Amino acid sequence: MGKIKRADLDLIRCFAIIFVISVHGLSYVGFYELSNPSITLFVCHLIRVIVIICVPLFLILTGYLSAEKEYILSFKYLEKPFRLLAIYIVCALICSIPQFMRGEIKSFFVALFEFKAAPYAWYLAMYLGLYLMIPFLNEFIASKNGGGKSIFVLILLVTLPTVTNNCNFNSFEWWNGSKEQSSQLFPNYWDELYPIMYYMIGAFLKRNDAMANKLKKITLIIKH
């Protein structure tokens, strides 16, 4: 028996894709260069407020669809991230051809490890990080005794950026520089629990959806 297609989830995906296109489309119509108050600026701001939820929608969907699955950290589970990393490296090499021609090899490697060597690579970095954390998140969600080990791993993962992002590969005097000049070994959005929060919202919705279905079944049984 094949999987049942969920029209509501497909609809959310469609809206999320349209919102992504809309967010980036605003930069092409000159929205970010507008400064004087006008109807155009107001309308663009209103559109941006609505469509900026594009990434959160994808993260919530990920939590909804993945929270109740059992994942094991194995070579097979890690195959997908390695394939995506290979694609990223190829794209980064192509996008960095002008840098190579100027002899900027060092800046290329810095950008590569910061996921800035290709346009919008931050999104890939975020999803890869979330993908690697899903087994721990799901264990934490399913655990009935508090999931002590999972909590420790989560705390470790979200505090690592603060500890490791205080160096600057472009200067030997990194210790005396500002945080804005630091190189990011781990993206800052992990400090804010941004992806985890939306994943948990999706997991919460899935759990309540399952509970609602159980209540419906119980109600039908009682009626019969």
Question: What does each of the following model-derived ranges do?
Answer:
Residues 1-163, 167:
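Membrane-cytosol interface segments of multi-pass membrane proteins
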